[in-house]
């Protein structure tokens, strides 16, 4: 099982590198502008004061120009999860799907390893891939936040990035499930993207649109409270939901993959 994990990570080392560079660039550019934004916060608040509650909700529902509001709206609530979700969904759909479509999965199945161990190895490799990129983004965010004196404790930023990682795992595991059941990579990516994007919109607007509160409960974004975490309030309920959703997808993928014929 370990050789499969190492091989999968080696296959994707360049992808991890470029994704890490992209996220580092995003973090540096975003936080480099904070001192300028902070100095003009009063004027900017007047300019943006007319925005509707629904519009504010799409960016985390916080004051854009306070330390927590800026970091949350510009990075933690939307942009970082968005980039990591693109990585995670593409990764989840290809861990099994790419090798199956390329006809190389038979080589893996021919090894003296069960389908269960193969699936576990692929899941662990995918999770490590996302974790490494997230950890790099988290470390750079903490360093940049300290450099621009944003005033948010490093532990709060790390906790928010961890919650972001767990959120992204739900989308990645859904793509993995769909690919493992033989839906194909395109379908796995498409359905997962619609679920993630739809969940973001519905989960964000649920605080201002009453009839969306019920439907929002089935979407991971409803439980993603990054602004509260940055303020120091860490709710384990959200992490439990993310973990249960991810585990459920993996278990269903395991049942499906071990029972079907792989072409």
What would you call each of these model-derived segments?
Residues 71-98, 193:
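Long, hydrophobic alpha-helical segments
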Residues 89-109, 123:
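Transmembrane helix boundary and interhelical loop/hinge segments in multi-pass membrane proteins
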Residues 1-24:
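Aromatic- and glycine-rich beta-strand/loop motifs that create alpha-glucan
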Residues 81-85, 133, 163-167, 245-246:
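Alpha-helical transmembrane segments of multi-pass membrane transport proteins
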